[in-house]
Amino acid sequence: MRILLACEESQVVCKAFRKLGHKAYSCDLLPCSGGHPEWHIQDDVTLYLDSRWDMIIAFPPCTFIAGSAVQWLSHPEDKHLPFEDRRPHPKYPNRRQDMEDSIKFVMQLYNSPIPMVAIENPVGLLSSQWRKPDQIIQPWMFGDEATKTTCLWLKGPPNLEPTNIVGKGERTFFKSGKSHPKWYADALAKTKTKAERQLIRSKTFPGFANAMAEQWSK
């Protein structure tokens, strides 16, 4: 199979398909960090949405469409008003346009002529602005002791079957009372920039990557 991994600089999923003998290519505006530039297209993925591929698996940026993005869409003093009557957030006046552009990008990926399509994103605005996901999964369903709620919108590929259900992993608690999965808290402690934190949040666990490669390429 010829598989396009959209918005994947890490090449975790790309390499999982390559191990099974498939012609998989990652594509991202960033250079790859997975060690195989010969399998990486550093370019705008929308230039490659054509019938040369058998499947596209996309990991679009969630900055403007994750659940946490909702708080920045409107002025905090306008919560009592209907959404369409609320003013833009004073700190982020362009957030609504950013959200709309992000959703349009997802739709462009989903509606491509590629026969099989999978879109991965966290719980967020796609569910309300588009449609509910076909499946919600966790790393602990595929052998990785960690929690990271992940939604899948599928056109062609079947729902993934759990491969190895394990513990849900530890959590790190903070003085504020909030907590993060330990894998995420530990990784955040090592990062210095916003860009590094974004890459950490987009982490694909190996069990999930292997499940996609093994089950969707049959």
Model-derived segments and spans:
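Conserved active-site and SAM-binding loop architecture
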Residues: M1-K218
